[in-house]
UniProtKB/Swiss-Prot annotation:
This is Ribulose-phosphate 3-epimerase. It comes from Pongo abelii. The keyword Metal-binding applies. Its cofactor is Fe(2+); Mn(2+); Zn(2+); Co(2+). GO terms for biological process: carbohydrate metabolic process; pentose-phosphate shunt. Homodimer. The modification N-acetylalanine is found at residue 2. SUPFAM superfamilies: Ribulose-phoshate binding barrel (SSF51366).
Length: 228
């Protein structure tokens, strides 16, 4: 079985001038992991941060928090070792960004990280299937990657459902426009890792939002297990 339902705030939506404090606020509010978006200005139009920031956060936050790296970069092979050294726990690269996923998966594992494989909305989920048994997590984008605050794309849910049906033990993450109004659709489709940005980061009570998201996700997972 996939691991239990986990909620990962997207720190790109935080006050970046106080990034360490914002991460601590999320962890203190019950976040299961931190989702860190790395953008290079090539694979996506925007630019965020790289491994020096990850290294600084690891030093400030200690070894316990789980860093889920979403690598929206055109050369994901280039950043595996730097991210591993910086303290990343999971390295999710885009299928669209490499011609040799197998070698990249091997490199990530050899550098001591878990492997995530992401697909954009326009990429058919079947292209991910040959690699599903070699990875720890599949990331289904529910917005076009590159910018925060976009509208959730409900028509991505069949991808999640297909993955859950075909690969019951796979962690499936959704990212983009996910919050209290949309999480039930993700959970019912089979997602068990929920990335949420502004819905958590901009809430006056992030703990209550995290708990709500987790409860909806857990209830859907329990229902799926009963329906088998």
């Amino acid at each position: 079985m996939a691991s239990g339902c986990k909620i990962g705030p997207s720190i790109l939506n935080s006050d970046l001038a106080n990034l360490g404090a914002e991460c601590l606020r999320m962890l203190d509010s019950g976040a299961d992991y931190l989702h860190l978006d790395v953008m290079d200005g090539h694979f996506v139009p925007n630019i965020t941060f790289g491994h020096p920031v990850v290294e600084s956060l690891r030093k400030q936050l200690g070894q316990d928090p789980f860093f889920d790296m979403h690598m929206m970069v055109s050369k994901p092979e280039q950043w595996v070792k730097p991210m591993a050294v910086a303290g990343a726990n999971q390295y999710a690269f885009h299928l669209e960004a490499t011609e040799n996923p197998g070698a990249l998966i091997k490199d990530i594992r050899e550098n001591g990280m878990k492997v995530g494989l992401a697909i954009k909305p326009g990429t058919s989920v079947e292209y991910l299937a040959p690699w599903a048994n070699q990875i720890d997590m599949a990331l289904v984008m529910t917005v076009e990657p590159g910018f925060g605050g976009q509208k959730f794309m409900e028509d991505m849910m069949p991808k999640v459902h297909w993955l859950r049906t075909q690969f019951p033990s796979l962690d499936i993450e959704v990212d983009g426009g996910v919050g209290p109004d949309t999480v039930h659709k993700c959970a019912e489709a089979g997602a068990n890792m929920i990335v949420s940005g502004s819905a958590i980061m901009r809430s006056e009570d992030p703990r209550s939002v995290i708990n709500l998201l987790r409860n909806v996700c857990s209830e859907a997972a329990q229902k799926r297990s009963l329906d088998r």
